[in-house]
């Protein structure tokens, strides 16, 4: 079954909400076509970091009341147990792969191996947040001697199933939510911003306890597709 994404505005709003960012929704910022041939890109030093990865879990958006949520959780207890055992190891090589891609473009790229705790960073508090990072990355600029920072921020992983109160309205879907941003650390302007809002249903039946192989396969395909989306603009 092909990937299904929500309407663009809804996806962007959801990514922003999940990232804990107040204010206007940040729209995508495409990487400039001549970015890798520009003098600015060639002379600066760019760090690559990934946020702490969330633990895969289930969510039931739309099951708004406490009793609704209890019913949804009870009906999917076996599925939730399996989803919580899903791995995130497949994502961990991504930052190093991005460093390699940037080096092949002739950039001075360095890997920041320690996972970034985005929530612990101070807010930037820009008067006009349009196309600006929401967090202040100044400490990383100083610590690592950086001019720019590429941040992979994954906010949610797992399986979600939409509800209307007590009633499911769709099949469960594997999800990956987050964003990628390339930040000019001199101004905190976004040189690239890619929201990630991916979902995929199982191919065929999903309700196959105890291992739920259809949903498991969908989850790992979502991870693969998300990584490809991030790497592709850096490999042109």
Please name every model-derived segment:
Residues 101-151, 160:
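Short, solvent-exposed, polar/charged sequence segments at loop or secondary-structure edges
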């Amino acid at each position: 079954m092909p990937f299904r994404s929500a309407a663009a505005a809804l996806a962007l709003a959801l990514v922003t909400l999940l990232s804990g960012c107040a204010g206007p929704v940040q729209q995508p910022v495409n990487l400039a076509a001549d970015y890798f041939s520009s003098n600015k890109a060639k002379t600066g030093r760019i760090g690559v970091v990934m946020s702490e990865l969330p633990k895969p879990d289930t969510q039931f958006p739309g099951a708004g009341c406490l009793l609704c949520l209890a019913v949804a959780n009870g009906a999917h207890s076996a599925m939730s147990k399996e989803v919580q055992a899903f791995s995130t190891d497949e994502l961990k090589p991504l930052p190093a792969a991005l460093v390699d891609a940037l080096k092949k473009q002739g950039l001075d790229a360095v890997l920041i191996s320690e996972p970034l705790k985005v929530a612990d960073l101070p807010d930037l508090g820009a008067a006009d947040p349009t196309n600006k990072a929401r967090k202040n990355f100044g400490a990383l600029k100083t610590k690592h001697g950086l001019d720019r920072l590429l941040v992979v921020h994954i906010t949610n992983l797992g399986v979600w199933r939409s509800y209307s109160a007590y009633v499911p309205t769709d099949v469960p879907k594997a999800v990956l939510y987050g964003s990628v941003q390339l930040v000019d650390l001199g101004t905190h302007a976004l040189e690239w911003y890619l929201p990630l809002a991916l979902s995929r249903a199982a191919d065929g039946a999903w309700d196959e306890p105890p291992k739920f192989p259809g949903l498991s396969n969908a989850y790992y395909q979502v991870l693969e597709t998300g990584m490809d989306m991030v790497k592709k603009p850096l490999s042109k």
